[in-house]
Amino acid sequence: MSSIVTTLSGYLGYRGREGHWSFLLHRITGLGTGLFLTIHILDTSFVYFAPSLYMEAIKIYQSTIAGLGEVGLVFCVIYHGLNGLRIAYFDMFAPKNWAIPSERKTFWWSLGLTLALWIPAASIMLFNLLKNNYGLFGG
């Protein structure tokens, strides 16, 4: 069995409840944010090195699939930031409170706060996407 399959089956097979899902979401959102930053730095460098490629990148970013990716990116940034603050708080200020019950409770709080911040932002972004790309809502 390949190491990737072994790793993925280990990640998905382990049933650590909230702590496990918190770890996985933190890892995935960090990778998503890092991927975006890498692509963003690369395409911004096109302004200097290849201006025509930069204009092509802008056209791609105006597409529907890129707009949906941006909605996902906003979730990644918000969750990764809030969960990182949660982890930093327990590591630096309240290490004695780092226990399974508090892990469960704070995971749900950080996920709920993420959704409370993300849903309005995603709604506005999707509204603008539908308006600008498909002419809906008087666009």
For the regions a protein language model found, what residue spans apply to each?
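Membrane-embedded alpha-helical bundles that constitute the cytochrome b-like, heme-associated redox core
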Residues: 1-139
